[in-house]
Amino acid sequence: MSYPAEEEDVNYDPYSYPNDYDYHTGDPKADLAYERQYEHQQTYHVIPEVIKNFLQYFHKTISDLIDQKVYELQANRVSSESIEQKIYEIQDVYENSWNKLTDRFFKTSPWPEAEAIASLVGNDAVFLILYKELYYRHIYAKVSGGPTLDQRFESYYNYCNLFNYILNADGPAPLELPNQWLWDIIDEFIYQFQSFSQYRCKTAKKSEEEIEFLRNNPKIWNVHSVLNVLHSLVDKSNINRQLEVYTSGGDPESVAGEYGRHSLYKMLGYFSLVGLLRLHSLLGDYYQAIKVLENIELNKKSMYSRVPECQITTYYYVGFAYLMMRRYQDAIRVFANILLYIQRTRNMFQRTTYKYEMINKQNEQMHGLLAIALTMYPMRIDESIHTQLREKYGDKMLRMQKGDLQVFEELFSFACPKFLSPVVPNYENVHPNYHKEPFQQQLKVFAEEVQQQAQLSTIRSFLKLYTTMPVAKLAGFLDMSEQEFRIQLLVFKHKMKNLVWTSGISALDGEFQSASEVDFYIDKDMIHIADTKVARRYGDFFIRQIHKFEELNRTLKKMPLNTGASISSSSTSRAT
């Protein structure tokens, strides 16, 4: 399995290898043409030397780690500095070298097939499984036209091989990978299932052979298979018990078990919980989506939240589930917290484009969902987030407050996840919009809730103007009958009362509260109204601004002062 390390390979650097430049002429146009031939080439009869060297180095880093892990397992050790160092090397290859070579040679075309590079890596089965995971992921993300039906099936079988290797070994598998890669494996596994679920419902442009192939293979990318993998990883890692002990202040290692003490299983188990949250949300089961996280304390920084994309995905789906469960106050809290986190850490992600694009998209979606939640349940949020929200969706929020259902539906359509049906379609009779049915069903449920609350914003604005008022008179102002107005007042009371998380680990816990700025009761034919709005604490705002000013002042003092000459030249250049 391991790649034999020769003496000259010890300080091997794939980018300094002299053969990297064998095909370069020194003529920029000729060299550009050379690189483009690999970018657009679909089948690689000749693999570039630099790619061969890179794959051999990549294989060596992984096989060396596996050899070291085998030694650690035999010595009954969980990890060591040597393992950590090798994981760091793999992370550098995974996050930097792979992406650089992809941009250079395979921007819109696939990497060489596993069969073509197998001899370069000694037919190492484990490395080839990991390589295929990256190979198919790249096809889904970058290759024009996306994956073929065969590639979708092959990718599924490769995931089966990967998870069988991890789950069905006699003991812990001798493998460790960077947390980022482990998260990407789970994230991509669910994405490809989601993609296939929508693909199989679009039969209009498929040939009879393709439809027959799909009909004869209903178990490929079956929802039960996907759920089984995620639950198996959770159970194998004993992650729920570990989280339970961790949140109560204990040592999770004491209950981790044979597999859970190893980072591979522990992190895959944790990421699988987030995967289950996502999957249940896509299926429209919001209660179960949040329930799988019952041992994760969202409002507390965790030792497990080391991957920013995982953190953001968790908050996006929890916030969306809260919104659909009509727990608006919790949805607002969750969205505001994660948007503040993104706002403060955004510069971290600009180094890697693919991460930045994903985070930027979810950032925009969560702003849209927050705008919906605040329209339906007005409450105070962080000033900086509120300012961003007004800039992005100020006009739409005004239209939503006036009951414009179309704006609600537009924002929901943009910001919601891509829902899917777990059921294999009847290929004999699939109508053209069958793949949109799960979305249309969720949109219908959401729109009905919005329509029930259509009058509440107007009623709230009238209630703020008075302390007492006859029911009949206020009903007249709103052009309603007294009976209809009483019904709307009851709706107001009901909708403004939310189950709100206050304490505890489970995100499903909570107590009924109202954050409405007005409250009222009816005594016979008279409405008695109370303003419950808490006065704005301007002191906190000014203290925050003073701290920001002091921080800016300290930063400016550390900056080197420009000389008079440079200032003079700068002024001259600007003048011209």
UniProtKB/Swiss-Prot annotation:
GO biological process: formation of cytoplasmic translation initiation complex; translational initiation
Domain PCI: 330-536
Location within or outside the cell: Cytoplasm
Function (record text): Component of the eukaryotic translation initiation factor 3 (eIF-3) complex, which is involved in protein synthesis of a specialized repertoire of mRNAs and, together with other initiation factors, stimulates binding of mRNA and methionyl-tRNAi to the 40S ribosome. The eIF-3 complex specifically targets and initiates translation of a subset of mRNAs involved in cell proliferation.
UniProt entry keywords in alphabetical sequence: Cytoplasm, Initiation factor, Protein biosynthesis
GO CC annotations on file: eukaryotic 43S preinitiation complex; eukaryotic 48S preinitiation complex; eukaryotic translation initiation factor 3 complex
Gene encoding the protein: eif3l
Major localization listed first in the record, in broad terms: cytoplasm
Protein family membership: Belongs to the eIF-3 subunit L family.
Name of the protein described by the UniProt record: Eukaryotic translation initiation factor 3 subunit L
Any Pfam family: Paf67
InterPro entries: eIF3l (IPR019382), PCI_dom (IPR000717), TPR-like_helical_dom_sf (IPR011990)
Keyword Protein biosynthesis: yes
GO MF annotations, alphabetized: translation initiation factor activity
Coiled coil start-end: none
Subunit structure of this chain's protein: Component of the eukaryotic translation initiation factor 3 (eIF-3) complex, which is composed of 13 subunits: eif3a, eif3b, eif3c, eif3d, eif3e, eif3f, eif3g, eif3h, eif3i, eif3j, eif3k, eif3l and eif3m.
